[in-house]
């Protein structure tokens, strides 16, 4: 389909949406009283439901159906899912994704929490927080390019422009190709995501810490509770809802990580993750069935985290 055709479809969809919305409002104006209020409420909800159905529900159902279509010879079955969970290269992708999902939320939250506690009520608190939060203002691709220069490797005969290798060379140590040598290269990519997300964790947790009533802190200190015990028995339980939100939010973002891997290694050298393989299957190998299976897997992994987050928020409300 050419560009004109795509734009025509887009404007047609917008026109249909506008007609439905106007028609619903006209219908609502014909009714009065409670019935009219209900119809009017439905008139405002209906367009949103239509958008969800067209933009979310229909593509989701279509993706699930496509995931059972076997690429190549055709047919329907579980072969795409079997490929994901049996082929060596795909098992490596799942392992890498698991490492990302476990390490990034936990380390980012721990670093953000530690930093929030250390700079709390310090003279340079605002400046110190701004330094850690700045990476959040950088796009994933921009952060990846920055860290790619940090990890840059050149043969010993050439001057090192990568920060880490320049330091190693200055210390008389052997330089390393950080993005090539596995499995450590996956951890070097994970560092980039932690660097970005630590600022988010610090901001949310710092606000939660400041929300703890001073009376509780003072009462605990009068009872002889201080230092780590104060953190364990007073601070941490008080900010638990914020910790849950931070961990789950970062976890969801980490499951969908794509930009960092794509920019820094392209998924090569055993660093690929589920989102990157979804892209490769669809756009590089033209395997719509396998790509859809990866997308469904990603959805299945994200849903439990979202549900858990909602349940915890309702409990703490």
Residue ranges and their predicted role:
Residues 4-6, 29, 37-317:
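A structural signal for multi-pass alpha-helical bundles of membrane permease subunits
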Residues 1-34:
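Transmembrane alpha-helices
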């Amino acid at each position: 389909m050419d560009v004109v055709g795509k734009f025509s479809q887009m404007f047609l969809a917008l026109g249909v949406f506008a007609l439905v919305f106007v028609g619903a409002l006209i219908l609502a104006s014909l009714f009065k009283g409670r019935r009219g209020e209900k119809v009017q409420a439905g008139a405002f909800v209906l367009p949103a439901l239509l958008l969800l159905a067209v933009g979310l529900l229909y593509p989701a159902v279509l993706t699930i159906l496509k995931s059972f279509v076997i690429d190549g010879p055709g047919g329907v079955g579980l072969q795409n899912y079997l490929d994901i969970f049996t082929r060596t290269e795909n098992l490596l992708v799942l392992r890498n994704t698991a490492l990302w999902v476990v390490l990034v939320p936990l380390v980012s939250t721990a670093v953000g929490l530690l930093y929030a506690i250390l700079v709390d009520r310090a003279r340079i608190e605002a400046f110190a927080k701004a330094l850690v939060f700045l990476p959040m203002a950088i796009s994933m691709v921009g952060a990846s390019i920055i860290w790619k220069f940090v990890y840059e490797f050149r043969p010993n005969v050439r001057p090192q422009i990568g920060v880490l290798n320049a330091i190693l060379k200055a210390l008389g140590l052997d330089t390393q190709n950080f993005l090539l040598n596995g499995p450590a290269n996956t951890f070097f990519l994970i560092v980039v995501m932690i660097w970005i997300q630590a600022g988010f964790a610090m901001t949310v947790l710092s606000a939660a810490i400041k929300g703890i009533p001073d009376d509780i802190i003072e009462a605990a200190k009068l009872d002889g509770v201080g230092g780590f015990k104060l953190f364990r028995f007073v601070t941490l339980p008080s900010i638990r809802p914020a910790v849950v939100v931070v961990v789950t939010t970062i976890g969801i973002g980490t499951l969908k990580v794509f930009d960092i891997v794509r920019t820094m290694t392209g998924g090569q050298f055993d660093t690929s993750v589920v989102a990157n393989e979804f892209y490769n299957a669809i756009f590089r190998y033209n395997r719509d069935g396998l790509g859809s299976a990866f997308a469904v897997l990603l959805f299945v992994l994200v849903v439990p985290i979202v549900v858990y987050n909602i349940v915890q928020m309702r409990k703490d409300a």
